[in-house]
């Protein structure tokens, strides 16, 4: 039964438009996992998604004049192995920026 508990894993997926804010959040999560004696692997960078929007510059004619805007979504994965109850409580109380989307799987 103890081997089943040792094989437990928490997978945290993080998404953000700002890469620096995402890296700071990853550092906070890894630091929290290390202080509670859990093993953290990551952050593993995933491919960045680029979404490009094409907009007409003029409100009337001039279809040849266009402007491009893009959003980049940076993504990371962190795996936490053998989490304890303290680890889960510490991760729940962790204060992360609002610009970072967090998805947790047990």
Swiss-Prot record:
GO (cellular component) term, any one: ribonucleoprotein complex
InterPro entries with a match to the protein in the record: Ribosomal_uS10, Ribosomal_uS10_dom, Ribosomal_uS10_dom_sf
Signal peptide limits: none
GO MF annotations in UniProt: structural constituent of ribosome; tRNA binding
GO BP: translation
Entry keywords, A to Z: Ribonucleoprotein, Ribosomal protein
Domain of life: Bacteria
Known role: Involved in the binding of tRNA to the ribosomes.
Subunit structure as annotated in this protein's UniProt entry: Part of the 30S ribosomal subunit.
Family designation: Belongs to the universal ribosomal protein uS10 family.
Protein name stated in the entry: Small ribosomal subunit protein uS10
Source organism (scientific name): Synechococcus sp. (strain WH7803)
């Amino acid at each position: 039964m103890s081997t089943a508990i040792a094989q437990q894993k928490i997978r945290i997926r993080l998404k953000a438009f700002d890469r620096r804010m995402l890296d700071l959040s990853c550092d906070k999560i890894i630091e929290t996992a290390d202080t509670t004696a859990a093993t953290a692997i990551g952050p593993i960078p995933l491919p960045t998604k680029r979404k490009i929007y094409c907009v007409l510059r003029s409100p009337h004619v001039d279809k040849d004049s266009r402007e491009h805007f893009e959003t980049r979504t940076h993504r990371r994965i962190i795996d936490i192995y053998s989490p304890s109850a303290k680890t889960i409580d510490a991760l729940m109380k962790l204060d992360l920026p609002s610009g970072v989307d967090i998805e947790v799987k047990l």
